A protein has these predicted regions:
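Extracytosolic ligand-binding ectodomains
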Residues: 2-9, 14, 20-108
Length: 108
């Protein structure tokens, strides 16, 4: 009888108290102007996204802002950096001229 109780206890413990899975964090990249004439717009977007994440109240979302400087070549460089970091979701860029070289990015 004691063996049966131990067995039931072990099964109960394994079913309800073990979390054997890993939760992967969601990485979101921001391509915004953080330098140059439009840095105020970029800073506002970073703050707005930060407030939205704070409202969601989740530790599973990480934000990675990168500077575009409102230049196409800097935007491409920042996009490659985000890709190397494993970021799959990107918000931005803000300005149309920053999109010029982004078609070279296949996995974003």
């Amino acid at each position: 009888m004691i063996k049966v109780i131990k067995f039931i206890f072990i099964i109960y413990y394994l079913l309800f108290f073990q979390t054997a899975y890993a939760i992967e964090k969601i990485k979101i990249g921001l391509l915004v102007p953080m330098t140059g004439a439009n840095k105020e717009i970029g800073n506002s977007i970073i703050k707005a996204v930060g407030l939205a994440i704070k409202d969601i109240d989740s530790d599973l979302i990480e934000i990675y802002p990168k500077d575009t400087a409102t230049k196409a070549n800097q935007t491409l460089k920042s996009a490659f950096e985000l890709s190397e970091m494993g970021v799959k979701v990107i918000i931005g860029p803000v300005f149309h001229e920053s999109l010029t070289y982004l078609d070279e990015m296949e996995n974003l």
